[in-house]
Amino acid sequence: GIDEKELSRLRQEMLSCTVENRAKDLLALNPAWKPAIDAADRHQLLQTILTYLKSQKELDLLNNDGIPRMVRGYFYETTCVIFEAARVLKHGAYFIMVNDNVRYAGASISVDILLSEIAGQLGFEVEQILVLPNGKGNSSQQMGMHGREALRKCVYVWRKA
């Protein structure tokens, strides 16, 4: 086993999609991820969301300054996972993912749509996005400022093209 300090070190080393973690240079970790990084860079809605969150940080309107880095890290790291799945799966194989949409600074982020569009660019056909019953709510920080909004929890069904 490992102690809490070692677990924290590993988490910091491996992930950037938490508010306390530093951004990672994904291309330094694996130069073969360039097509994945390019797909995320080209996704206009994702870039608009990241720009919005950065502006909210600059205006001191976020409850945590790490949110823009965390959201960027999540989408870029997940894009690399999707890229790797497309690389190793056989033609016709299914890739299924369960995920929640999220809301930051009053802006709902349709994670299901964004990731499915990116998956389509990286070699998957989007077969279905199944919406699970009882959408989750947003955080108490969001509700206090922006009200409650039910967010979709979905199952993505993609097939390797």
Q: Where in the sequence are the language-model features?
A:
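Class I S-adenosyl-L-methionine-dependent methyltransferase catalytic core
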Residues: G1-M97, N101-A161
